[in-house]
Amino acid sequence: MQLFCETPGFDIRPNVATIGFFDGVHRGHRYLIEQVRAVAAGRGLASSVVTFPVHPREVMQADYHPKLLTTCDEKVSLLAKTGVDYCMMLDFTPEIARLSAREFMSILKERYQIQALVVGYDHRFGHNRSDGFEDYVRYGCELGM
């Protein structure tokens, strides 16, 4: 697994990704990553996980300090064991938090060569977590993902 923060220092191959904090890399996370790997293999693409070193809610709420199951290093080690090709460790900033889901998906496609996103049925993101699965599908169609 190749790990990078923000901008890859290598030519990243077109890939299928999932996105989340992945604390503990539990059974549900591993199932989702298996789906990413299967979709990627079916399309002849690499597989990737987009995650964050700090819980996004900590960035938005100064008084939020969750008790985590794993350190960032432990999370990376567990993700490497899933067989995923890339781990993209992005800093979650207030600027990212203000992006719409569509804007964020566009950045993922252009900067990180993500061709498709695989998300759980209840995953939400975008400014104020305003967008869900149906929105992913619509934006994905609009962006060619």
Residue ranges and their predicted role:
Residues M1-M145:
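Nucleotidyltransferase catalytic core that binds NTPs
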